[in-house]
């Protein structure tokens, strides 16, 4: 991304309203209120914001607050103070911290062209430190960059021992083999790209996807695991409700279309080994080898499959349960043990149930396309 692009984006953003708050009368008064931090594209412009609805079928999902951003956003993170962090889709040049509904302006962090954001950021439990996956533009090597949450200044940087690092999650289990010390699990997507061609994939025969465990205090490598099939990119992560298993959404990068379309979309990690979970034929081919967002509830695993226009569901043991139809399904989140899934014109409450509850998208979302991820706002 050039300095000219950054200056142009800043000039555009200077003329944008930082926050748009919908009046409270726009929302229904029945059922419990649900709010989700999300990102979307609408008529060529890009936004992050807060979406709001109430529990119960037919309650519209409305835009409650929004911030226009210069390019597509990807991952979001909510801090304990209620502020929302969002990063640009890889290779991204911006990260923003924003407090919806306060009237205060957003806090921007721009890359200098020597590195890029990889789409995901994670906060420490107290919200004081941020951990983002980033990539060096010259070498292609990925890192975890630790930043102060208030100033966004870098305080540490650790290698992920791979390329194309994507999502990262905490492992705070006492029985994780590392005492009571929290560790970070990071998915190295392993897909080679070049700074001059952005997201264009190249040299896929050299793919090297893995998950790594890092000491969260020092960044020391504590373990690294790979699948047998090197053309499966490990990307998005979610713990089972009991934290015994980590689910990983996969994206296939095989040269052969048939192999790519029938590839699994889910892998499971028990702390010592990785294994893929396959859907039965002919369902597997319909999934197109592309897993988007990842979530887990007491009912089981959910992997959004936007190319299949549905959500692939599995038991917690990995048995196939079914494909929940939802056009352009992508963002997933869990609230009170129930799965919320976002689609093109409506979203689903309790999407794994026999009869999910549909929430039509309100006027602010009509014609909009939700991005890959959203996060439930508590309270």
Protein language model regions, located:
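Blade-loop segments of beta-propeller domains
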Residues: 68-79, 83-97, 103-123
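Repeated scaffold domains used in trafficking and secretory/extracellular systems
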Residues: 71-77, 116-122, 163-169, 232-237, ...
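N-terminal secretory signal peptides and thylakoid transit peptides that target proteins
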Residues: 1-16
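Asp-box/WD-like beta-propeller blade repeats and closely related beta-sheet repeat scaffolds
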Residues: 114-120, 133-171
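Beta-propeller blade signature
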Residues: 144-148, 204-216, 263-271
């Amino acid at each position: 991304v050039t300095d000219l692009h950054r200056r142009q984006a800043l000039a555009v953003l200077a003329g944008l309203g930082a926050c748009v708050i919908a009046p409270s009368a726009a929302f229904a008064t029945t059922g419990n209120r649900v709010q989700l931090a999300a990102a979307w594209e609408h008529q060529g412009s890009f936004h992050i914001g807060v979406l709001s609805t109430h529990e119960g079928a037919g309650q519209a999902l409305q835009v409650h607050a929004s911030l226009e951003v210069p390019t597509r956003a990807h991952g979001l993170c909510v801090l304990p103070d209620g502020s929302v962090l969002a990063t640009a889709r890889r290779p991204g040049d911006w990260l923003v911290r924003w407090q919806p509904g306060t009237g205060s302006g957003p806090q921007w962090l721009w890359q200098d062209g020597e590195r890029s954001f990889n789409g995901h950021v994670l906060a420490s439990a107290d919200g004081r430190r941020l951990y983002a996956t980033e990539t060096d533009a010259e070498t292609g090597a990925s890192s975890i960059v630790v930043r102060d949450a208030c100033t966004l200044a870098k305080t540490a940087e650790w290698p992920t021992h791979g390329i194309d690092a994507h999502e990262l999650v905490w492992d705070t289990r006492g029985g994780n083999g590392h005492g009571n010390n929290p560790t970070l699990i990071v998915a190295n997507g392993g897909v080679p790209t070049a700074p001059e061609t952005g997201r264009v994939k190249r040299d896929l025969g050299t793919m090297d996807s893995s998950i790594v465990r890092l000491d969260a205090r020092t960044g020391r490598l504590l373990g690294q695991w790979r699948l047998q099939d090197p053309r499966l990119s490990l990307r998005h992560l979610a713990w089972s409700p009991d934290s015994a298993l980590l689910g990983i959404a996969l994206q296939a990068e095989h040269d052969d279309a048939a192999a790519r379309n029938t590839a699994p979309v889910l892998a499971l990690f028990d702390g010592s080994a990785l294994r893929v979970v396959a859907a039965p034929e002919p369902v597997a081919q319909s999934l197109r080898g592309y897993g988007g967002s990842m979530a887990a509830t007491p009912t089981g695993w959910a992997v959004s499959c936007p190319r299949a226009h549905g959500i692939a569901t599995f038991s917690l043991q990995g048995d196939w349960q079914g494909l929940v139809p939802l056009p352009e399904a992508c963002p997933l989140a869990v609230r009170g043990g129930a799965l919320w899934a976002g689609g093109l014109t409506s979203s689903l409450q309790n999407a794994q149930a026999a009869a999910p509850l549909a929430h039509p998208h309100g006027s602010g979302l009509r014609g909009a396309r939700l991005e890959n991820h959203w996060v439930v706002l508590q309270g």
